[in-house]
């Protein structure tokens, strides 16, 4: 369906019998109305043609071959000059055969049938709305017992019987003793109700708004009573309050979606289009049929039997009619959800039939496999590995995947640059993988985003757009900060890559789906591009440093022998176990030359205008120099003062890991301010 904003959407829910009839019924040009499936047959065994009014009837679902009717006559589709649009002999329209993929039929049920999803699945919607135990409703649906239908204030047999006797045999066995068959039918239609028809009557009598009001009043009364002190009673009250909340939410949903409760009981059963439940001929002339066809046949057989009992055979006992209604209910249950009531129905080879629920649910169902996760062209799949040097909005595509995804664009580039006269020559050049091919591929990729998806796609951040670049190897490179949105890690996870082809898809990818535009969680608003897992471990190792404190220094005589190999003679820093550096570049250079370790403590000269937060007011130790200057040593910094106590310089105690992290953060902040100043100048702010 299409909403008012012209967005295609799919909504699953209950529909009215009138809507089912509108889907399936169609009026032929001669005024005849078709759409009802009345026969359980598929194809005639001699002619191999669909049976009339059967499950594959061409009058109902359309022709098997476009423009050819059941008689074999041919008409050009859409040509008004060649005569009528349908065959007057067989009643088949001359239309495209693709109509058999969406044209539905229907079965008119001889008795109402409850939809098993709303009755048996938990929570049971029917039981919640009627506020009755599920076992009681099941007994009513499957004709195990009946209930009295109130008829104003007129005297009825049931009222009279209730006035004289209270304990007597069940209605099912006592009532037929007083009436003949004809009398029983009259009595039954007047005073008692059973089966799904009884459920339908109760649902039709519900006023959802009054139901909500009563539920609110009862919920408030239970809340005002408070705790009773009895644990069992308190639990019972809590369960009742939870039930009332569920009941109100369900009623509000029915009101909001304009769904009537009685629609949960079926009077018309939709029949799927034949192309969605095909019969295929395999080698040897054997036929393979969808299980849905066999389940439909079972429903039609039992429904036709019940129709005959109700219309033609007037001498049929009432018990037999009730039994046949139960069989129809069970057949529809098996069609919708095989095995929901116990043992599933099996074929002659002891194989369980696949019902409608089995066809649509699960990973291999219609939705997840065909509609949501269907295989498409211009897509690939590979393992993801970390790409720490990538930008946040970039991903690395292996050459093997990239050349296949963008092959058509590369072919167009080769032809436009007159490097290939036609498509065949261009493909041969691509197979040769010359340098010009990679140059054109890189040029194409610069202007074309790709979409990365990791299953299962549970929220919108499961699919994000990236700017691709070529990488070596056969794995997709991904920035580690985007892993949380995908719920991915680098232990063998696979991701699919798709190429948006249309201009609308490319614009949507650039404006809405790029990874650097999805930094916050759409659900709770918290940052989602945050370091996780390996990055946190790396940052910890980078900034952990040496656990030795300032007191474990070279003045300890027991440590001098252990750290003699760490003495460094250089003009830039003193000859000590913990060297001094004038700037961060010298410290990182010494680390690259393997003079110090990543976690080795060192003293780095700090700018005087930058504040140093003191952890202790009094210095731990003071060193005096012959020149008159002295060093005040604190826990994490050192101050060099003159004779007049003027601060000459400050050193902080740190590691190469801390310096590297600080420089990365500083560069990121400076880049942000440069980008911000550029934007303000561009917009004249």
Swiss-Prot record:
It catalyses: RNA(n) + a ribonucleoside 5'-triphosphate = RNA(n+1) + diphosphate. SUPFAM superfamilies: beta and beta-prime subunits of DNA dependent RNA-polymerase. Its cofactor is Mg(2+); Zn(2+). Its EC number is 2.7.7.6. DNA-dependent RNA polymerase catalyzes the transcription of DNA into RNA using the four ribonucleoside triphosphates as substrates. In plastids the minimal PEP RNA polymerase catalytic core is composed of four subunits: alpha, beta, beta', and beta''. When a (nuclear-encoded) sigma factor is associated with the core the holoenzyme is formed, which can initiate transcription. This is DNA-directed RNA polymerase subunit beta'. It comes from Gossypium hirsutum (Upland cotton).
């Amino acid at each position: 369906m299409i909403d008012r904003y012209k967005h295609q959407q799919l909504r699953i829910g209950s529909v009215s019998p009138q809507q089912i009839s509108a889907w399936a019924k169609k009026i032929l040009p001669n005024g005849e109305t078709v759409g009802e499936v009345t026969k359980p047959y598929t194809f005639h065994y001699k002619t191999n043609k669909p049976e009339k009014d059967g499950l594959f009837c061409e009058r109902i679902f359309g022709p098997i071959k476009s423009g050819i009717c059941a008689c074999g006559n041919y008409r050009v589709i859409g040509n008004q000059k060649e005569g009528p649009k349908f065959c007057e002999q067989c009643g088949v329209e001359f239309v495209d055969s693709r109509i058999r993929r969406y044209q539905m039929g229907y079965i008119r049920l001889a008795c109402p049938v409850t939809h098993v999803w709303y009755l048996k699945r938990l929570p049971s919607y029917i039981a919640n709305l009627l506020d009755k135990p599920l076992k009681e409703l099941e007994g009513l649906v499957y004709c195990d017992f009946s209930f009295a239908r109130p008829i104003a204030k007129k005297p009825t047999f049931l009222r009279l019987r209730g006035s004289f006797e209270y304990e007597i045999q069940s209605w099912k066995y006592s009532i037929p003793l007083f009436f003949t068959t004809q009398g029983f039918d009259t009595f039954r239609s007047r005073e008692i109700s059973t089966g799904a028809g009884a459920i339908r009557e109760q649902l039709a009598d519900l006023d959802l708004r009054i139901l909500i009001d009563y539920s609110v009043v009862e919920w408030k009364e239970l809340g005002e009573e408070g705790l009773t002190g009895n644990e069992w009673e308190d639990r019972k009250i809590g369960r009742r309050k939870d039930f009332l909340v569920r009941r109100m939410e369900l009623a509000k949903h029915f009101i909001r979606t304009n769904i009537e409760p009685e629609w949960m009981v079926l009077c018309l059963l939709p029949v799927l289009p034949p192309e969605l439940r095909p019969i295929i001929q395999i080698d040897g002339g054997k036929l393979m049929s969808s299980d849905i066809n066999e389940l439909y046949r079972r429903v039609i057989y039992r429904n036709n039997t019940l129709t005959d009992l109700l219309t033609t055979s007037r001498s049929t006992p009432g018990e037999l009619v009730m039994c046949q209604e139960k069989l129809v209910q069970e057949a529809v249950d098996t069609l919708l959800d095989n095995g929901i009531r116990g043992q599933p129905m099996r074929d002659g080879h002891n194989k369980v039939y696949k019902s409608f629920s089995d066809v649509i649910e699960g990973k291999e169902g219609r939705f997840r496999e065909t509609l949501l996760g269907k295989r498409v062209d211009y897509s690939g799949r590979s393992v993801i590995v970390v790409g720490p040097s990538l930008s946040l909005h970039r991903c690395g595509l292996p050459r093997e995947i990239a050349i296949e995804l963008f092959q058509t664009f590369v072919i167009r580039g080769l032809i436009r640059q007159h490097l290939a006269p036609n498509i065949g020559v261009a493909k041969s050049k691509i197979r040769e993988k010359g340098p010009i091919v990679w140059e054109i591929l890189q040029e194409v990729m610069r202007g074309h985003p790709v979409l990365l998806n990791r299953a299962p796609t549970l929220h919108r951040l499961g699919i994000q757009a990236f700017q691709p670049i070529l990488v070596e190897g056969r794995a997709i490179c991904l920035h580690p900060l985007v892993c949380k949105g995908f719920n991915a890690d680098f232990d063998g996870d696979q991701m699919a890559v798709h190429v948006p082809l249309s201009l609308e898809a490319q614009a949507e990818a650039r404006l809405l789906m790029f990874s650097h535009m999805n930094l916050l969680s759409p659900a709770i608003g918290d940052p989602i591009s945050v370091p996780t897992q390996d990055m946190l471990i790396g940052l910890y190792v980078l900034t952990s440093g040496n656990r030795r404190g300032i007191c474990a220094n070279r003045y300890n005589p027991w440590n001098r022998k252990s750290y003699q190999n760490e003495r460094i003679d250089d003009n830039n820093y003193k000859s000590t176990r913990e060297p001094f550096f004038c700037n961060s570049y010298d410290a990182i250079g010494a680390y690259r030359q393997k003079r110090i370790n990543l976690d080795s403590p060192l003293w780095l000269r700090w700018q005087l205008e930058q504040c140093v937060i003191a952890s202790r007011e009094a210095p731990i130790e003071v060193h005096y120099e012959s020149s008159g200057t002295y060093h005040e040593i604190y826990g994490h910094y050192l101050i060099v003062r003159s004779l007049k106590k003027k601060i000459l310089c400050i050193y902080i105690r740190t590691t190469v890991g801390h310096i590297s992290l600080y420089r990365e953060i500083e560069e990121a902040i400076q880049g942000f301010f440069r980008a911000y100043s550029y934007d303000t100048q561009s917009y004249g702010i």
